[in-house]
Amino acid sequence: MALYETILIARQDITASQVEGLTETFTGILKENGGEVKKVEQWGLKTLTYRIKKNRKAHYVYIGHEAPAAAVAEMERNMSINEDVLRFMTVKVEKIEEGQTAMLTNKGERSERGPRGGFGDRGPRRDFGDRGPRRDFGDRGPRRDGDGPRAEGGRNEGEGDRA
């Protein structure tokens, strides 16, 4: 038997107990067909990157299991039939990691680091008065505003009196 990791995404409008019921249903299918569930994690309600079937949030569930291919196929068939499951993905792995997955580990580290900042903590804006005077490389005509070194008379060459 091979080792697999399955992630399923369930609709946002079902309760946490219903998500647990879904998880028990799918792990039961694996056990009935000769598989063994190694690890189950509820990652909770998370915001989706894009809408899936009109849902902006979804419940994520991780299942690490060892099962024959027929058991995995039967579980995936039941997931595709179930209307509460938005998406699922099963991947064959070499080993199932002990302890928490990265999704749960990062959640704890993030809160220990403190606030990550944003646009509100940048401080006052500089006034851009530190640039100095405009430079003249000699490859352009005179400037119209009076602060350039070649601005004389306020008009460009070739601009005469127009009638």
Swiss-Prot record:
One of its GO terms (molecular function) is small ribosomal subunit rRNA binding. Gene3D superfamilies: 3.30.70.60. It comes from the Bacteria. InterPro entries: Ribosomal_bS6, Ribosomal_bS6_sf, Ribosomal_S6_plastid/chlpt, Transl_elong_EF1B/ribsomal_bS6. Keywords: Ribonucleoprotein, Ribosomal protein, RNA-binding, rRNA-binding. One of its GO terms (cellular component) is cytosolic small ribosomal subunit. Binds together with bS18 to 16S ribosomal RNA. This is Small ribosomal subunit protein bS6.
